[in-house]
UniProtKB/Swiss-Prot annotation:
The lineage of its organism: Bacteria, Pseudomonadati, Thermodesulfobacteriota, Desulfobulbia, Desulfobulbales. GO terms for molecular function: adenine deaminase activity. It catalyses: adenine + H2O + H(+) = hypoxanthine + NH4(+). InterPro entries: Adenine_deam (IPR006679), Adenine_deam_C (IPR026912), Amidohydro-rel (IPR006680), Metal-dep_hydrolase_composite (IPR011059), Metal_Hydrolase (IPR032466). Belongs to the metallo-dependent hydrolases superfamily. Adenine deaminase family. Its cofactor is Mn(2+). It comes from Desulfotalea psychrophila (strain LSv54 / DSM 12343). Keywords: Hydrolase, Manganese. Its EC number is 3.5.4.2. Pfam families: Adenine_deam_C, Amidohydro_1. Transmembrane segments: none annotated. One of its GO terms (biological process) is adenine catabolic process. The keyword Magnesium does not apply. This is Adenine deaminase 1.
Length: 594
């Protein structure tokens, strides 16, 4: 998004009407998010920039393309203020094809899942892919990788020294996903990244679920200025009263909008000016069935927010918070011509989308063919771990027979993991899973060829009666995670991923029930959203057939390695107490017996 002196000269001339507009949108209602107004106005565009709004007849020339938008409402391209696009299992190209027709023209992302598996070399390839896409990605450099505490294993460690380099890149718009624990523990790399950002006058993006009181104050003193993690509207209000810009998250697995928007609809309407929206993690299925940021706007309107206010939350509010409002966020002269046309403000159905002044989508479909680039070996990376045997997933203890008192990580929701103490049988020195009482084995295997780490613990909440499921896509480190009732099936599942370069798989009785290949970094695919959604449905049905009743069994599983989510997690270094930030032994006591 670099601007040359000559390009600036041409744009100024177009703004003054000296050069005719390339395109004029005529007859529509302009949603002016700057003045909080909706009124009849035309829009003149020169190449990729807006040059005039209102009466623009004098901007027309003989070659100007005039598009009749009578009756439609024109609003800025929607911005997802915090997104891991990789969690959709769609590559940037495939993701753009899915969300741009829904009106999303910009996302703010750390592209951190790509970095964790392929480093800066892979990131540069993704940047090239973004430039050929109609979707803008405003990149924040991850505050560090891995995010986990204690430190897990990734392909690339994002350190203070790396920040000193990448914060100078033109693609860098800030520091991404600064978790509270890293600040609280005064992690040296984290403090170095934040100090570098402040010296470079770059914003620092946060991740601080349940941070209140002194913890919040200390976090804010580190320079963090916005957050996307609040579990209730009181938390939103406290953070905003202390100076934070808040993003309300409405993802595929966490539906916080209805609760968090109460900060605006019930506590203080004035807060709306410093509230934005994000989806964080969204599935291909949800995009196809509900939409993307357009769905979030509709949900906000349904919750009682005025339509123009909801649109501001999805556009200019994010743009100003991330300091990108000189480029996007409003339909005003000088801004990039990312424009969404909807049928009405209340129904908010997207009819057409322009990005960079070009019509790219109409009637929820792309207007041109967008192809993914050829993949190099950097992103088509193999899973560099040894094949497994059933013994790798047997929890061995010193007693031959008896029982084991065990701490099982009990999933109550995608972001709620509590302690559950259970008693399991021990046979031939092996602690047995207990499907009748919903206790499975879970393991994470390092897959980058660094150290061969493998952890083993116990989990509850999936209710599998038999079989196993595994994934090589598992934020934040994207090592292989596998869980199951049977060690043999767990081994088969992991080996299938290794042999096929990554993906997600369901196994039972030694047979592969369903497999979704994720060949790009082992985390995403170039398949269309429709095909990913179809295969996601088959995976869920396969898990359901084994007894699981969770709405998205694999997504619930692949969030388990995130140590920023209380109270428990598991990484390649072991099961983690996310409050104490230490690994722990899941065996509480052993009781010998016959």
């Amino acid at each position: 998004m670099q601007v040359s002196k000559d390009a600036l000269k041409q744009l100024i001339r177009a703004g003054r009407g000296v050069i005719p507009a390339s395109k004029v949108l005529e007859g529509g209602y302009l949603v002016n998010v700057m003045s909080n107004e909706v009124y009849l106005a035309d829009v003149a565009i020169y190449e990729e920039r807006i040059v005039a709004i209102g009466k623009v007849e004098e901007y027309k020339g003989p070659e100007t393309e005039v598009i009749d938008v009578t009756g439609l409402y024109l609003l800025p391209g929607l911005i997802d203020g915090h997104l891991h696009s990789e969690c959709s299992k769609l590559s940037i190209t495939s993701f753009a094809k899915a969300v741009v027709p829904c009106g999303t023209t910009s996302i703010v992302s750390g592209l951190d899942e790509y970095i964790s598996v392929s480093g800066l070399e892979g990131l540069q390839e993704v940047f090239k892919e973004v430039k050929k896409s109609p979707l803008k990605v405003f990149w924040g450099a991850p505050y560090k990788t891995p995010y986990t505490f204690p430190k897990s294993t990734v392909a690339f460690n994002f350190t203070e020294e790396v920040h000193q380099e990448v914060q100078q890149w033109p693609e860098c718009f800030g520091v991404w996903e600064t978790v509270r624990e890293a600040v609280q523990e005064e992690d040296e790399d984290t403090l170095g990244a934040l100090a570098t950002a402040q010296n470079n006058r770059l914003p620092i993006f946060g991740c601080a679920p349940m941070a209140r009181g002194k913890e919040l104050n200390g976090y804010l003193c580190a320079g963090v200025r916005l957050d996307h993690e609040s579990y209730d509207h009181e938390e939103v209000v406290e953070k905003m009263r202390n100076g934070m810009h808040m993003l309300i998250r409405e993802s595929s697995v966490t539906h916080f909008l209805e609760e968090n928007i109460r900060a605006v609809t019930e506590v203080n309407p004035y807060l709306a000016r410093r509230v934005s929206f994000c989806t964080d993690d969204v599935t291909a299925t949800d995009i196809l069935e509900k939409g993307h940021m357009d769905n979030v706007v509709r949900q906000a309107i349904k919750a009682g927010v005025e339509p123009i206010t909801a649109i501001q939350m999805a556009t200019i509010n994010s743009a100003e918070a991330y300091r990108i409002d000189h480029l996007v966020g409003s339909i005003t002269p000088g801004k990039i011509a990312d424009i969404v046309m909807v049928d009405s403000l209340e129904g908010f159905q997207v009819q057409a989308v322009l990005t960079d002044g070009k019509l790219v989508a109409r009637d929820k479909k792309m207007s041109y063919e967008l192809k993914a680039p050829a993949r190099s070996s950097v992103l088509s990376c193999a899973l560099k771990c040894a094949t497994t045997t059933p013994e790798d997933f047997q929890y061995r203890v010193e007693i031959e027979q008896g029982t084991a008192e065990v701490l099982s990580m009990n999933v109550k929701g995608p972001f709620v993991r509590k302690r559950r103490d259970v008693t399991l049988q021990v046979a031939n020195h092996i602690v047995q899973a207990d499907t009748e009482n919903d206790v499975l084995m879970v393991s994470v295997l390092e897959r980058f060829g660094r150290n061969g780490n493998k952890s083993l613990a116990f989990c509850s909440g999936w209710k599998l009666k038999k079989g196993a499921m595994a994934s090589s896509a598992a934020p934040d480190d994207n090592n292989i995670i596998v869980m199951g009732a049977d060690a043999s099936d767990m081994s088969i599942a992991v080996n299938h991923l290794i042999e096929n370069g990554g993906g997600q798989v369901i196994v039972a009785d030694g047979e592969i029930l369903e497999f979704l290949a994720l060949p790009v970094g082992g985390i995403v695919s170039d398949l269309e959203a429709e095909e990913i959604a179809r295969q996601e449905s088959l995976l869920t049905k396969a898990a359901n057939s084994l007894g699981c009743d969770l709405p998205d069994p694999l997504m619930y599983m692949f969030f388990l390695p995130i140590t920023a989510i209380p109270d428990y997690a598991i990484t390649d270094v072991g099961p983690v107490d996310c409050i104490a930030l230490t690994t722990f032994d899941p065996i509480l006591a052993l009781n010998p017996g016959k």
